[in-house]
Amino acid sequence: TQVYAFTRFKYIIDFSGFSQLDKMNLDDIEFQCNGIASGIMLAPSGLIFQIRDCFISQPKDRGITSIGTGCQGMLVDRCQFLSNEGQVRAQDRTSIAFNTNGNDVKIRENRATQFRHFAVLGGSGNLIIGNHWFQGDSETQGLRLAGIVLAQTNVRTTVVGNYIDNSSIGWTNEYEAAPDFLNQFSFGGLTVTGNHFMAIDVAPSFKWLLIKPYGAGHFVQGLNVSGNVFRCTNGSVDRVEGVDTSFAPLDNGRMRNVVFQGNGFNGVTQPSENPTLFEVNQATAAATWTALPGAVLPF
């Protein structure tokens, strides 16, 4: 049993009175929220909403909110999202730059400062390219939250060429009403390539890629993490990827097509690699050789 509270935020521009809104374009506008209002609420349905070359400054709660599928195919290009919570500890922030529920969203060349999350993406088919979001604070060994939250398992999402600063990629199936693995696709379809991952003054337990299954039986069946740079300063982190087992672990016996290769690691105690090369010494003839690669394999 859970108890839910619902809060209706106030927005500078509220399109929720439209039943459907297609091909709307906002260009070269500064939304001065001043910690009093949120930015933009989308219509409950629609296609190809575009916002480009805009500033959304100091939103109280949300920069852009999708309450339905008005974000289907949304384009967010070259915008700046400036938080009202820059002086607040990362774990105490509540504002989110934007969320989506629909598919095929393109997020390109944006900059976002010190929100709780940069993006909460409920759909699949996302292209996240060339952005810089940073979420640090002044704490020593501080906590860091997800910059991007992917809220379904088979995401068909590409994260390429971003500067991911003091935040992580969080991957959950939180939106599933029945979160246990049955006959759906499990966690897969994610490509993370050519990004700069940075962390400063974080706890050693921090991970840049964190999977959190909300039900039992899930596994990873299609993940490519390659050509990235991971760097931690003013301390080190144990490793770059992990699983939050608060609700359930992953089924490692069913993992397949998980690639970690060509990445650079600085300030990381245990780098991850798959496929990996290591030496096995077998002293006597045997039908079965046991190979123990240790902690180098992901997850």
Please identify what each model-predicted range represents:
Residues G227-C232, V237-V240, F247-G253, N257:
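Beta-strand-rich solenoidal segments
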